[in-house]
Amino acid sequence: MGVSGSGKSTLGALLASALGATFLEGDSFHDAAAVAKMRSGQPLNDADRWPWLDRLGAAIDAEVRVNGLVVAACSALRRSYRDRLVAAITAPTRFILLDGSPEELRQRLANRAGHYMPSSLLASQLCTLERVAPDEAATTLDAAASPDRLCAEAIAWLDSGGHPVEEQKR
């Protein structure tokens, strides 16, 4: 999870491959109207996001029931969005926030080709982002690390039980 340009898709694909899991790209579940809205530089609002989260949550749950393990790349910027996904998925759900500096994220977006999300929306995503709370089954990783290092750190966290942030500090 994280804002645009944080490396969600890169880490998600690597992690899914390493775990033998199915990878789902959350961006693929946006409807045409939401994609057009973002492409035109308008940020999404909750009314745009709820149906997307419902489609993604249903797809994750269906895939879990068939294949057992799923990794999904999804912004999940607010706690309420993460809670919505958790409610839709009948298996334990963990979140990994990829946290990067605004400068690094802007640079990544400037160098990214072929994506509908313009870099002009980064500021609104950063304002919307609610960092993971201590009671969430989540961890935060430094988006500046290499994809291989992020994958290794994610696997280590998952192997340790993927405990909520407050339990990691004990």
Where are these regions (language model features)?
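Conserved lysine of the Walker
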Residues: 8
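Conserved substrate/cofactor phosphate-moiety recognition/catalytic segment
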Residues: 13-56
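ATP-dependent NMP and nucleoside kinases share a basic, alpha-helical "lid"
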Residues: 64, 75-113
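P-loop (Walker A) phosphate-binding loop of NTP-binding proteins
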Residues: 3
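Small-molecule kinase domains that catalyze NTP-dependent phosphoryl transfer to phosphate-bearing small molecules
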Residues: 111-153
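C-terminal accessory "lid"/substrate-recognition subdomains
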Residues: 158-170
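Structural recognition of the conserved hydrophobic beta-strand(s) that form the central parallel beta-sheet
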Residues: 70-74
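Short, amphipathic alpha-helical "lid/cap" segments that border enzyme active or binding sites
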Residues: 53-57, 147-158
